[in-house]
């Protein structure tokens, strides 16, 4: 209960600091960078600590440590993919597409806050294992779909940039 609450409170502050800086006009590239770096360390750290705790306190459930390691690996890669793709899309002058309420609801199991609250069940053994494994499976499925979609989107940006370069070269030749 204490771990779940502490993680949730930490996540709440992590979410709030960016909102407060935007509302007050105090946001900066440095602040955004620090926030992303902290997130990049926090995300896999939760799972690696879970793997270590499983091996220390529940070694008979070693398979859950493997789930935790895979979960950490996937969330780390997903985070990097998301950050880079957003930067590339923004740099290309394209608008970011966000899903609606249904998408937010469907992706709720991938929300770090849900993960944090799942640790409230740690002391109950099996319910935690089932929920944590479910959250990991959803993260793997979401990451697979998201990575494929992002790759297609970025390939389309590359194709559009190549086409624009060809057209610019043709216009340059016709002027010469």
PLM features: residue spans?
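Membrane-embedded alpha-helical segments that form the functional core of polytopic membrane enzymes
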Residues: 1-30, 67
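Internal amphipathic alpha-helical segments of the cytochrome P450 catalytic fold
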Residues: 17-18, 31, 128, 141
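Membrane-interface alpha-helices at helix entry/exit sites of multi-pass transporters
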Residues: 29-37
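A feature for the membrane-embedded catalytic helix bundles of lipid/isoprenoid biosynthetic enzymes
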Residues: 36-166, 170-176
């Amino acid at each position: 209960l204490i771990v779940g609450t502490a993680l949730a409170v930490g996540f709440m502050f992590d979410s709030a600091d960016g909102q407060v800086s935007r509302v007050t006009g105090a946001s900066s590239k440095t602040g955004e960078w620090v926030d992303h770096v902290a997130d990049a360390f926090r995300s896999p750290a939760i799972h690696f600590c879970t793997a270590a705790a499983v091996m220390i306190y529940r070694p008979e459930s070693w398979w859950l440590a493997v789930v935790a390691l895979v979960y950490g690996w996937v969330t780390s890669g997903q985070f990097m993919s998301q950050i880079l793709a957003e930067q590339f899309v923004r740099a290309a002058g394209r608008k970011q597409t966000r899903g609606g309420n249904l998408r937010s609801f469907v992706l709720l199991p991938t929300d770090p806050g849900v993960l944090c609250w799942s640790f409230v069940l740690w002391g109950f053994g099996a319910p935690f294992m089932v929920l944590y494994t479910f959250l990991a499976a959803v993260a793997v499925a979401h990451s697979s779909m998201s990575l494929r979609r992002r790759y297609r989107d970025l390939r389309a940006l590359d194709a559009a940039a190549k086409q624009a370069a060809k057209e610019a070269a043709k216009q340059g030749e016709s002027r010469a």
